[in-house]
UniProtKB/Swiss-Prot annotation:
Belongs to the transferase hexapeptide repeat family. LpxA subfamily. It catalyses: a (3R)-hydroxyacyl-[ACP] + UDP-N-acetyl-alpha-D-glucosamine = a UDP-3-O-[(3R)-3-hydroxyacyl]-N-acetyl-alpha-D-glucosamine + holo-[ACP]. GO terms for biological process: lipid A biosynthetic process. This is Acyl-[acyl-carrier-protein]--UDP-N-acetylglucosamine O-acyltransferase. Coiled coil: none annotated. It comes from the Bacteria. GO terms for molecular function: acyl-[acyl-carrier-protein]-UDP-N-acetylglucosamine O-acyltransferase activity. The gene is lpxA.
Length: 262
């Protein structure tokens, strides 16, 4: 179904069954598969392939040579019915690739809202990306990576499969991430290590002075004491009773499976 207000260049191929909502603009030489749905006011520049079971929300901008929803690069994949879901207001720049999920994961690769993926970013199968994230040129995510809200990842950074990146994290360019990165932290290097807190980012996003001070205290517990992760977790729970924002640390440590960067 193609809405009558959609604008589609005659050189583009839209397979029967695709759903194109109102005021979508599809430029030249695009291919849209039969199981694709594209939300209102989304713009496809040119030379874009969207395939598989792919749902794209409203007001996204997708640039040339992007490939979305294609078969993943997991050798176990046997053409099972898996998908990708993309929210609203995302900018997906040139040559970005986002692959469909696997049955070993949750069958879905999921992108939130208001993200910027710069040139040549690769998001592998089963990744879950939150909202308001920025990934600079040539960032590569392995399978099953989770990136929480308001995270910034510098160019040429690679993140190992199954890693979790906490909210408001900033990762410097050319880093290699092989373990989980707790919330609010600046990390850099190969392998990535912590370099303090993303204080400037917290201020820009309106965190109160008391919350920032509490986050500093939590960082000292986790990284400036001799505590094990388990004993640090108990100390953080006590701090969270007075400052609920610290529950971000506690919940993250509970979720972590690969261990945290130290």
């Amino acid at each position: 179904m193609i809405h009558q207000s959609a604008i589609i260049h005659p050189s583009s191929i839209i397979e029967e069954g695709a759903i194109i909502h109102d005021n979508v603009h599809i430029g030249p030489f695009c291919f849209i598969g039969a199981q694709v749905e594209i939300g209102a006011r989304t713009l496809l520049k040119s030379h874009i392939v969207i395939n598989g079971i792919t749902q794209i929300g409203e007001d996204n901008q997708i640039y040339q040579f992007a490939s979305l929803g294609e078969v993943n690069q997991d050798l176990k994949y046997a053409k099972e019915s898996t998908r990708i879901e993309i929210g609203h207001y995302n900018q997906i720049r040139e040559s970005v690739t986002i692959h469909r999920g696997t049955i070993q994961g949750k069958k879905v690769t999921k992108i939130g809202n208001s993200n910027l993926f710069m040139i040549n970013v690769h998001i592998a199968h089963d990744c879950i990306i939150g909202d308001h994230c920025v990934m600079a040129n040539n960032v590569t995510l392995g399978g099953h990576v989770r990136v929480d809200n308001h995270t910034i990842i510098g160019g040429m950074t690679a993140i190992h499969q199954f890693c979790i990146i906490g909210t408001h994290v900033m990762i410097g360019g050319c880093s290699g991430v092989v373990q989980d990165i707790p919330p609010f932290i600046i990390a850099q290097g190969n392998h990535a290590t912590p370099f303090g807190l993303n204080i400037e980012g917290l201020k820009r996003r309106g965190f109160s002075r008391s919350s920032v001070h509490a986050i500093r205290d939590a960082y000292k517990i986790l990284y400036r004491s001799s505590k094990t992760v388990e004993s640090a977790k108990e100390a953080l729970k006590a701090l969270a009773a007075e400052h609920p924002i610290i529950n971000e640390f506690v919940d993250f440590l509970i979720r972590s499976q690969r261990g945290i960067i130290r």
